[in-house]
């Protein structure tokens, strides 16, 4: 059984009510529940964490190096465009990760079109709303099952 870690960045706790025309009506609790069911059905465990604080996410990524985490799914949200610290933590722990976005950042404002994570990620899933998480989990489960 592999352990997967799902990290949600700032403002994702507001999913379902924040700009639903951009991010949809699905809540973060709904997403986490669906991911837990998906991982469990494949015989794996998942832990989810949302934080609006960069240092909390950095601390959790650093802990992943020693706690048996096999794969990370991360939606850095606004930190996508600003967080060298989170990028450096992911690079330092060397746990493979997939970058996730509900919307497609490439179709949004210019400042949202640069990611500090994409070049380090195994892959990027974006633009499919809450399904972006499901597709990323599918890919992660295939990878951990192959090892």
Curated annotation (Swiss-Prot):
Chain positions of site Transition state stabilizer: 18
Pathway stated in the Swiss-Prot or TrEMBL entry: Metabolic intermediate biosynthesis; chorismate biosynthesis; chorismate from D-erythrose 4-phosphate and phosphoenolpyruvate: step 3/7
SUPFAM superfamilies: Type II 3-dehydroquinate dehydratase
Ligand binding (substrate): 75, 81, 88, 102-103, 112
Transcription keyword on record: no
Listed InterPro entries: DHquinase_II, DHquinase_II_CS, DHquinase_II_sf
Keywords on record: Amino-acid biosynthesis, Aromatic amino acid biosynthesis, Lyase
Catalytic activity: 3-dehydroquinate = 3-dehydroshikimate + H2O
EC annotation from Swiss-Prot or TrEMBL: 4.2.1.10
Active site per UniProt: 23, 101
CDD domains xrefs: DHQase_II
Coiled coil segments of this chain: none
One Pfam family linked to the record: DHquinase_II
Keyword Cell cycle: no
One example of a Gene Ontology biological process annotation: quinate catabolic process
Molecular function GO labels: 3-dehydroquinate dehydratase activity
Function: Catalyzes a trans-dehydration via an enolate intermediate.
Family to which the UniProt record says this protein belongs: Belongs to the type-II 3-dehydroquinase family.
Subunit structure: Homododecamer.
Protein name: 3-dehydroquinate dehydratase
Species name: Stenotrophomonas maltophilia (strain K279a)
Gene behind this protein: aroQ
């Amino acid at each position: 059984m592999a352990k997967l870690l799902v990290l949600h960045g700032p403002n994702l706790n507001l999913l379902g009510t924040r700009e639903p025309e951009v991010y949809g009506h699905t809540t973060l609790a709904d997403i986490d529940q669906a991911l837990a069911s998906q991982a469990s059905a494949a015989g794996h465990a998942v832990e989810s964490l949302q934080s609006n604080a960069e240092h909390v996410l950095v601390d959790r990524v650093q802990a992943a190096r020693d706690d048996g985490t096999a794969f990370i799914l991360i939606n850095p949200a606004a930190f996508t465009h600003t967080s060298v610290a989170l990028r450096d933590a992911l690079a330092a722990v060397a746990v493979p990760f997939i970058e996730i976005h509900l919307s497609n950042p490439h179709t949004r404002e210019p400042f949202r079109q640069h990611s500090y994570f994409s070049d380090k990620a195994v892959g990027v899933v974006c633009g499919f709303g809450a399904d972006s998480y499901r597709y990323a989990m599918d890919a992660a489960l295939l990878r951990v099952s192959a090892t």
